[in-house]
């Protein structure tokens, strides 16, 4: 009965506290956490066969992307795919790891339906790389510290397993899909350097961006291209491994629950008895449940694989690969957050961080487009900052690409950076208002999507402005502008709205009046002139 109370009471309290957003680490009970990340490599072929790597193809039929080796037909032998070694080299160098110039493959023995060989080929004794690190910065990531370095214990190349699919119903059938079998993985093991949840979340995001930037993995947890296990302990009691964590929110919630569970056990004086041995627990979506303990753990009987030669890499090869690595996200963020761009972190991340796989634009291509527009702008307006082109590209332009589902590479040669700058220049010259510029930009992107504009099209902005009568109403005199403003005010039935506006109690009402003026003029009036006239007519003092 006492054992049951240990399990249920913290569960009920955790769910209650978590629902109310009350989770917090207790300073007297230190969280120590490490991660094991399996990164599925998007190589052309599998790790030890010439089978096409279709791991990311979710529409392929089961057991159609397999070879004799993948299904472990007797007599078949492995042939190492060196593209996987190249990808591992890129990742190891990007994580500042020490690459073992000679590494080996080993057999990890266990029996499971989706592992037809009876063992997994991995690197246990001589892993591919060791002693790496990934540094998190408070200026770029959402962490409390100015700087936090997470040490990487090792990186190892290994083969993925197949998938077990459990059918519902009375027969309890288990089906095996071996399409994923022998797909190359890199297993990354960190030191237990994480001390709070913010650090864990920031590391996962930064690592996802890294593998996407290197173009070695999609980094998607939801599709299984990246899978993460968590090792966790409280106050240096025995480590608990958490499995079955399909996404970032599951990882966060599982850590919260497990911390609360161990905290309750320790506070009740049961730590020495219940947290003495390492154990593996699974996440059900609401709690962690015991899968196995030290007594029931598997003896993997590691042994060197006699069929696969050592991986031997020359120093000059490592240096050549290093010279091809892309600029780090941290360096790019520093570039765009400093002069001449001076972007806030939110906008800099749009250009630099592949937080999500965005099908509308490639980040490198977007950075080039942005820089080219800024170069044109600086030549014309050397004394101006770059706030205007930044806002137009990172808000209006990207917003239209996403809204209309139009890819940047489809529009790049039609709405060139110089043409985009011309749109901004016409707006600054007063030929067209900001609202009309937005309408014109939307029209151009939409015409690219529908095929009206093609790569052979020559966009003439002035011609389009005349065709759609988007010219700014620059011929209107002050008296006519005053008449428009008074007409809008006369149509306002809510006298209290005007009183609160004049007194300053509801200053936002002025934007409403300006919006009415822009609507009546179809965006052709200057909003600043409208606001100035409304202030004059209403005698606004604030």
Curated annotation (Swiss-Prot):
Enzyme Commission no: 6.3.5.-
Pfam families: GatB_N, GatB_Yqey
Gene3D superfamilies assigned: 1.10.10.410
Superkingdom: Eukaryota
Keywords assigned by UniProt, alphabetized: ATP-binding, Ligase, Mitochondrion, Nucleotide-binding, Protein biosynthesis
A molecular function GO annotation: ATP binding
PROSITE patterns given in the database record: GATB
A GO cellular component annotation in the UniProt record: mitochondrion
GO biological process terms on file: glutaminyl-tRNAGln biosynthesis via transamidation; mitochondrial translation
Transmembrane segments: none
Keyword field contains Transmembrane helix: no
Catalyses which reaction(s): L-glutamyl-tRNA(Gln) + L-glutamine + ATP + H2O = L-glutaminyl-tRNA(Gln) + L-glutamate + ADP + phosphate + H(+)
Cellular compartments annotated: Mitochondrion
Miscellaneous remark of the record: This protein may be expected to contain an N-terminal transit peptide but none has been predicted.
Job of this protein: Allows the formation of correctly charged Gln-tRNA(Gln) through the transamidation of misacylated Glu-tRNA(Gln) in the mitochondria. The reaction takes place in the presence of glutamine and ATP through an activated gamma-phospho-Glu-tRNA(Gln).
Binding partners and assembly: Subunit of the heterotrimeric GatFAB amidotransferase (AdT) complex, composed of A, B and F subunits.
Family: Belongs to the GatB/GatE family. GatB subfamily.
Protein name: Glutamyl-tRNA(Gln) amidotransferase subunit B, mitochondrial
Species of the source: Candida glabrata (strain ATCC 2001 / BCRC 20586 / JCM 3761 / NBRC 0622 / NRRL Y-65 / CBS 138)
């Amino acid at each position: 009965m006492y054992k049951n109370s240990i399990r249920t009471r913290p569960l009920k309290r955790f769910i209650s506290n978590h629902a109310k957003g009350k989770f917090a680490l207790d300073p007297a009970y230190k969280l120590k956490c490490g991660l094991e990340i399996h990164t599925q490599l998007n190589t052309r072929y599998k790790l030890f066969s010439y089978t096409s790597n279709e791991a990311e193809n979710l529409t392929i039929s089961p057991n159609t992307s397999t070879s004799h080796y993948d299904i472990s037909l007797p007599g078949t032998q492995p042939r190492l795919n060196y593209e996987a070694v190249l990808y591992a080299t890129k990742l190891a160098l990007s994580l500042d790891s020490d690459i073992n110039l000679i590494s080996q493959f080993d057999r990890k023995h266990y029996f499971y339906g989706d592992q037809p060989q009876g063992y997994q080929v991995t690197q246990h004794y001589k892993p591919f790389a060791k002693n790496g690190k990934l540094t998190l910065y408070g200026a770029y990531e959402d962490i409390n510290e100015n700087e936090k370095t997470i040490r990487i214990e090792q990186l190892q190349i290994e083969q993925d397993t197949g998938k077990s699919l459990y059918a519902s119903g009375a027969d309890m059938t288990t089906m095996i899909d071996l399409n994923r079998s022998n797909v190359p993985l890199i297993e990354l093991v960190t030191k237990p350097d994480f001390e709070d949840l913010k650090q864990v979340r920031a590391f996962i995001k930064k690592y996802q961006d890294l593998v996407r930037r290197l173009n070695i993995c999609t980094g998607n947890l939801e599709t299984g291209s990246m899978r993460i296990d968590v090792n966790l302990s409280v106050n240096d009691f025995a480590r608990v491994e958490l499995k079955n964590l399909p996404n970032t929110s599951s990882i966060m919630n599982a850590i919260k629950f497990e911390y609360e569970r161990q905290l309750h056990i320790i506070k009740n004086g049961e730590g020495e008895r219940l947290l003495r041995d390492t154990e593996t627990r699974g996440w059900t979506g609401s709690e962690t449940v015991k899968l196995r303990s030290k007594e029931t753990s598997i003896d993997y009987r590691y042994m060197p694989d006699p069929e696969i030669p050592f991986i031997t890499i020359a120093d000059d090869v490592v240096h050549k690969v290093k010279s091809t690595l892309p600029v780090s996200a941290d360096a790019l963020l520093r570039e765009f957050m400093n002069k001449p761009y001076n972007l806030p972190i939110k906008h800099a991340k749009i250009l630099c961080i592949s937080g999500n796989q965005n099908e509308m634009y490639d980040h490198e291509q977007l950075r080039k487009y942005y820089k080219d527009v800024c170069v044109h702008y600086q030549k014309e307006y050397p004394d101006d900052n770059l706030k205007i082109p930044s806002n137009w590209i990172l808000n209006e332009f990207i917003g239209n690409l996403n809204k209309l589902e139009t890819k940047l590479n489809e529009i790049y040669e039609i709405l060139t950076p110089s043409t985009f700058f011309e749109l901004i220049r016409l707006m600054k010259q007063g030929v067209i208002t900001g609202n009309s510029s937005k309408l014109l930009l939307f029209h151009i992107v939409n015409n690219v999507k529908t095929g009206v504009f093609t790569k052979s099209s020559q966009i003439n902005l002035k011609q389009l402005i005349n065709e759609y009568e988007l010219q700014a109403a620059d011929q209107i005199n002050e008296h006519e502008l005053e008449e428009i403003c008074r007409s809008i005010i006369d149509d306002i039935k809510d006298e209290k709205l005007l009183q609160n506006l004049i007194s300053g109690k509801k200053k936002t009402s002025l934007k409403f009046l300006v919006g009415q003026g822009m609507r009546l003029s179809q965006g052709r009036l200057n909003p600043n002139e409208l606001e100035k006239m409304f202030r004059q007519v209403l005698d606004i003092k604030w």
